[in-house]
Amino acid sequence: MGSPEERFHFAIDRGGTFTDVFAQCPGGHVRVLKLLSEDPANYADAPTEGIRRILEQERGVLLPRGRPLDTSHIASIRMGTTVATNALLERQGERVALLVTRGFRDLLHIGTQARPDLFDLAVPMPEVLYEEVVEVDERVLLYRGEPGAGSPVKGCTGDLLEIQQPVDLAALRGKLEGLLTRGIHSLAVVLMHSYTWAQHEQQVGTLARELGFTHVSLSSEVMPMVRIVPRGHTACADAYLTPTIQRYVQGFRRGFQGQLKNVQVLFMRSDGGLAPMDAFSGSRAVLSGPAGGVVGYSTTTYQLEGGQPVIGFDMGGTSTDVSRYAGEFEHVFEASTAGVTLQAPQLDINTVAAGGGSRLFFRSGLFVVGPESAGAHPGPACYRKGGPVTVTDANLVLGRLLPASFPCIFGPGEDQPLSPEASRKALEAVAMEVNSFLASGPCPASQLSLEEVAMGFVRVANEAMCRPIRALTQARGHDPSAHVLACFGGAGGQHACAIARALGMDTVHIHRHSGLLSALGLALADVVHEAQEPCSLSYTPETFAQLDQRLSRLEEQCVDALQAQGFSRSQISTESFLHLRYQGTDCALMVSANQHPATTCSPRAGDFGAAFVERYMREFGFIIPERSVVVDDVRVRGTGRSGLQLEETSKIQSGPPHVEKVTQCYFEGGYQETPVYLLGELGYGHQLQGPCLIIDNNSTILVEPGCQAEVIETGDIRISVGAEAPSMIDTKLDPIQLSIFSHRFMSIAEQMGRILQRTAISTNIKERLDFSCALFGPDGGLVSNAPHIPVHLGAMQETVQFQIQHLGADLHPGDVLLSNHPSAGGSHLPDLTVITPVFWPGQSRPVFYVASRGHHADIGGITPGSMPPHSTTLQQEGAVFLSFKLVQGGVFQEEAVTEALQAPGKISGCSGTRNLHDNLSDLRAQVAANQKGIQLVGELIGQYGLDVVQAYMGHIQANAELAVRDMLRAFGTSRQARGLPLEVSAKDHMDDGSPICLHVQINLNQGSAVFDFSGSGSEVFGNLNAPRAITLSALIYCLRCLVGRDIPLNQGCLAPVQVIIPKGSILDPSPEAAVVGGNVLTSQRVVDVILGAFGACAASQGCMNNVTLGNARMGYYETVAGGAGAGPGWHGRSGVHSHMTNTRITDPEILESRYPVILRRFELRPGSGGRGRFRGGDGVVRELVFREEALLSVLTERRAFQPYGLHGGEPGTRGLNLLIRKDGRTVNLGGKTSVTVYPGDAFCLHTPGGGGYGDPEDPAPPPGSPPLYPAFPERGSVYEYRRAQEAV
């Protein structure tokens, strides 16, 4: 056996379709290989086969397949694998049982209670990973010194704890033995507060291993962080995936002599570090493959481009990964993959459902790319297997892919080349739809050629991929144009120039091994060992010594672990982190002090406080110096430097580059002659003028016109991107431009939201993301709205239009308006809307409006939180703004708005705002968000011209109108075909008996409808009155649900609809009426009535279950999940929020640590869903035990009238609110009340179930294979932001 330099080093990326092998051979030269990950006819394991081939070729010795390979010539093997990801996607992991604290058996099913898709009535959600649940009799509480509590114990965080009930191991033993007899051998153990008191989990784990369980994942070991829900999901994923990974590793080892005993074998983890194969676990493996690519460009492109920040762009067949590197890895500590939230360090790799295999559609006049994908089978149309038309087909039609450069592996026999003819045929069908649409309008437009249609889809795909890059950079205060675009992956080279140009980037860097950069990254990566523990300390001089002691202990653990792997101390470096947040907020940042040396006012490990303040300012634009800083976790990352040293350079070339051939590629101006070069024949110094194609074995690079490529010393390609030419289009409808403008308009609203979230200070806006930002036309009509909070959808438009009518000409540059009044389009008073007009030179009136609506935690009134259950007038609910100039002539009117916010204090029994500082800060943030919108609108007008931008504003509204008309026409046609009338109706009641009535008359010819709410009840004395804007929001939400696919959500959705709402009714009350319950309760009933009229689904729980708890010291508010209604083809989802709300619920451990309550139960309410061919979803049972005297308020519905069933389905069970006094007396509180509670009292909330659908005696169809959820999942911080934004 020779020295490591005389042996082979392999780095292997085992992907879902291909396995890439990168080998450094003896002598230092490199060999690369790409082969199919699955080819059972020829080999059992792709990585082993790749190693065999290279050893055979390099050594010139025949190595028969199937025999264990001699390892004497192998020094190391590094691998990234999608084994864990695929097992998660396909739900092919180990059989698992969940062991959880009694009372929480359904906690992971309920999760955050938010649904992933606001507008999908079926509420598709991933099934839990565990097969069975065992409730463990044990309970740990945070110590509060109540009488009879006993002596406290100290947790590892420093918190004092009360062991209310030790683990009953005797009772648990029999349950575990039962699991073993049923064939379950893997456990996830998740107990309340085990992040700080792990002893109970350890006792359970010891018993389970003694009984013979082969794998036990303790949540306190897998990820010791507070919040039981994500920690529980992580432990389940670990128990589900680790046995699968271990089996794969053992199978891989058997392919080698001695089972790789003398070979260093390392696997890439999700955090970008390598780990020994024995320490490679499921919860740390889901990004194993993509992480290699980030390491690859961070160690190559970043260095070669002089330390300029880099955006990684990895475009594959089904999705695209986007990431960022600026000198250090960017990690997230909670992210979802395949619907499972993992609480573990992961590189922030943002995956979007847009890739070469993304399908192309023409829908209601709009070019649509994805998110559906052709997958590997059948693949794109050009694969010759009958697949759909995709982005790859569009590129092939445009001449940007050359079939001759691909191997003949396509067709049923996998022996044919790519088929341009199949691509053209599939695209021609879509082109016919496009041209039919263009010919059908009142002013027929010019027909589009096949190439123009293909080009349109490519441009739309590019814009779709630009949006997450903008979000990833601008969300953290970075300018995307200041970055280099590092392009890798099989499909990215065809799009890199266009994407860089659209983002204003000057440079694209494509590594010479870009087609297998993930494998290269594995070769260059270091071995990492991390140690982390939770903490509960303030960041103050008094705690610095404790923090240093903890960090030193963790550092010692990391060093010992790395030295045990053979690293010397000189090869090991460590980096310390503190997970910090401001007191009273949830926004924690994991900060390193590497760039902030220790001072006399910091821990010895570094000035973490300065690092925190600097990063907080950069990401959010402000700091909160008056608040203390809290340490949630301490963490140390140890690195053993072990990456290979690659010295490849390219020879200087004196002659011109060799042109392999000249082909024809289609660009904006038509076909152009395009030289083709082979990457392997290019050398250092060669310069290539665009357009041209550069072909490699693994990728195709398109250098667009106006761009110039050069080969640099390392053999990489650097492309200088020319500036984007001015956009010369006219005001006539162009479906391609319509799709691009749809993205651009939405991007403006999204970026406004990013600025608002960054600069706001309150928890509601900054962390719960309870806000919306929107763009409006000169008439106040909605153009784009992001995100889609249902209750805001139609209401903001009413607000802007009211201000236009109210103020007339009294609106000038530098003015900003504030409004929340229900009669002015408001939903309820805490939702403050800030409106800014957009003026343009030469125009006397505003050309657009931008607005932001945010939920302020308090604006005064009779109760804290400004949501009183018993209000009878609007004034009791807080400060009222009909039309208020928040900024006048560019000056923020702080004194006047302060006076208005304090004005409710002048009313008997009321208070002014209880948090003026946050109100003012958030209002300034809303002004700043609007200003960003003005800037972006100005850039759009500057690029296209005012006439064009306003024309496409109208076109995009007309597109939404067309989609709704198509839906109404299809609904009417379906009824007519069945001999049914074109009129439908529905009626339901609020619990006080007030009817909500609806009659809908469909006009089949026009595709329009009249929605008539006549007959609805009168305005009520309480607060269930819903302003007209609420009904419009409910209607636009329902229309979007009924359309059933993504459409632009704007004014056009309501254009085909006439809405009749009687004045003075509960749906259009007088200006003085109380409305807080209308926003959160009546809105749900309106939705039930609309969907019931259309027969779309049975009633959902119809309630938000509003619960408020408060005293002089604290205040808490939550809304609670229930059952969703069943529909034609689906059972209702249990334990989820429905329709007009999607609020996430506070994690049980956070709830108990911050508020004086014990959460005794949070589980499903079996049998509460209505029976039917398809069952309604079950509600939940949530029981709170109080530890202090407080005022409990409940504001609920469906306590008298049951959620209806449809087509023979039975209704769901009514809700129930029970107060259980300490002495055992149980009282039914009714639907709406306030009551004083005392220590030991309990509140037990039973939420309603959903209605059933279809006759219960009709058997439901047998379940088929569960769909992958989603088949090509989005992930990363951008996705998590949008998911959180929609969960309000």
UniProtKB/Swiss-Prot annotation:
- Described purpose of this protein according to its UniProt entry: Catalyzes the cleavage of 5-oxo-L-proline to form L-glutamate coupled to the hydrolysis of ATP to ADP and inorganic phosphate.
Residues with Phosphoserine modification: S1265
Q: Keyword annotations for this protein?
A: ATP-binding, Cytoplasm, Hydrolase, Nucleotide-binding, Phosphoprotein
In its UniProt entry, what is this protein called?
Answer: 5-oxoprolinase
**Bias regions of kind Pro residues — which residues?**
1259-1270
Q: Read off the Pfam families from this record.
A: Hydant_A_C, Hydant_A_N, Hydantoinase_A, Hydantoinase_B
Question: Which family does the UniProt entry place this protein in?
Answer: Belongs to the oxoprolinase family.
Cellular component GO terms, alphabetical = cytosol
For this UniProt entry, what is the primary localization, expressed as one broad class? cytoplasm
The protein's enzyme class: hydrolase
**What species is given as this protein's source?**
Mus musculus
Q: Where in the cell is it found?
A: Cytoplasm, Cytosol
Q: Which gene encodes it?
A: Oplah
Where do the segments described as Disordered lie? 1248-1273
Q: Provide any one GO MF term from the record.
A: ATP binding
- Name the Gene Ontology biological process terms: glutathione metabolic process
Which reactions fall under this protein's catalytic activity? Answer: 5-oxo-L-proline + ATP + 2 H2O = L-glutamate + ADP + phosphate + H(+)
How it assembles, according to the record, is: Homodimer.
| Enzyme Commission (EC) number | 3.5.2.9
